[in-house]
Amino acid sequence: MRTETDEIRDNLKYLTLLSRDYPSQAAAASEIISTQALLKLPKGTEHFMSDLHGENEAFVHILNSASGVIREKVDQVLGDTVPENIRAELATLIYYPNEKLPQLKARCASEEALDQWYTETLLRLIDICRLVSSKHTREHVRSCLPASCGYILDELLHAHFEDHDKDLYYGQIVGSIIENGRADRFIVRLCELIKHLAVDKLHIVGDLFDRGPRPDIILDLLMRHHNVDIQWGNHDVVWMGAAAGSPICICTVLKTTLAYHNHGMLEDCYGINLRHLQRMAEQFYGEDDLSIWMPHTDAARGPYTEGMLHRCAVMHKAISILMFKLECQVIDRNPDFQMQGRDYLRRIDWSKHTVRIGEKEYPLRDTSFPTVDPAAPAALNPDEQLVLTKLVQSFRQSEKMQQHVEFLYAKGSVYHIENGNLLYHGAVPMTGRGTFATERFEGRLYSGRALMDYCDARARRGYYAPEGSAARQSGQDFLWYLWCGKLSPLFGRSAMTTFERLYVADSSTHTEVKDPYYTWYNDEAVCRRILAEFGLPGSNHIVNGHVPVREKNGESPIKGGGRLVVIDGGFCRAYHEKTGIAGYTLVYSSRTMSLRTHQPFESAEKAVKENLDIISQKNILETENHRILVEDTDEGEVLRERVHDLKQLVTAYQLGWITEARCEDHIW
């Protein structure tokens, strides 16, 4: 029978390495005590968002407000003493300190009035900050403080008043801050600290990219966030493939941005050179009827000149035909994708100007294909090849894009499990009978969790496999499959009907049939089976994005008897009319799990000026019988293992198996 001593002997190599950080019994014991204390703190608040679709202003607002958590803290601290309109102003100040602060200061008619406002605001912010910091150790709070004013903020947050007057003490410090012209900076720092401490973990359940204007701003903010994970959406993986240098993914990304007149973001923010594409497009398509290629526009982002729309439309057509050629090539290379029916350039009858889709032929809305050779429709002409070479070079050399995609790989995955919640963007592919769908890739069968794991691994191959290798090519092709493939867990539909929507007037060809998963996820038994597949008890939750919930038609985001929650963020403006809302977010605190329903967001400028918020409803999904502590979480499991290792280290010191550093602290 193995003893504890046997286990310590087996772990001696690891414990010796651990002793570098804790070179004495005193150091190890001190860490054990602080870690065991941490286990008894309340679980940190988790914030779940999904389907951001590049809508940076709405994202920033929901991030800053933590889906209403910040306002709840303001009301909790000040609700009995401060009028509602002042609390709304204070909440907006916390959301947007740099924008709101000048407005509030401008209302002060005199220096004395400004000093009074500074005093009241600083004291209120300190009280709110004390509340949100109560879930954290003092050491953690200190680590979040800015170096320039950290000592003073630490004093304000952690001072004790058993034997001296609180008002006098605070009054002296706050008065000195104002007198020395540092009030603005302290207000901004307190606002940022409140937002930092209010949410412990941010989960982004896919689709940072799409048609929205500034996905780059979203990624810049996420890269600065203190604790975030990402579950890839199908819009994300196609950008990941583009950054890896996949020609088909590059064309797909460009097709989407041009379709929504958002290519300026690629040029200005990522430094992508579209000059060669524009020149080729004008050469071959400049005189065409471009009516079906005109971009979707948003009046709020205009105005648009006729020349701007023409340039966008002509590039849209050029890149689309290039994309359809490359799709034929990818389908040829990957018969296991089972997409042979979607090589549409080969299914055109060039004499009749029709295309065969399934068993029927349909007339083409645009019959001009000057770069397509009917004898070899998938072949690129020299001009197209040059454009593609330049685009691949531009995407690969974009430093900012590479930084963003490396971050998506480092923080992202196909699915994520944390604290009993299973997070994924799209679907776990299923059959019509409600069983996990099975697919063969590279000679092996995959379904359920194994399919998700395979997708994750092959997606990483597309970026990290050696340049020029077959593995890298295979991985990049698969990133495109994850974007639009029938059994892609990130897509969850029968087909991406891009060609049909462009070229065929008959809307019956535009249908994208949802995976049976989206029927079966209403069944509680199926949701429990999915949870079990990922090693979770049936009482836990699935957090899903991807599919907008049509609330105005009576659809509920809560599926499967409460086991699954759809939180498509509804950030995409195009969906608001269909859904009746601007989507959902989820908040999981130490006491409750709550679904937050949002109304459409107009603009940050209006939110700052009018103290507007966009949360309209809070729906409690689950209330805990007892407050969840850190020891009840996944982090708690890691910390308990750490305590176990540290106790073994102490024993190893006591046995003389590891030499202890000299310690002057005789308490131990």
Q: What would you call each of these model-derived segments?
A:
Residues M1-W668:
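Feature recognizes metal-dependent phosphohydrolase scaffolds
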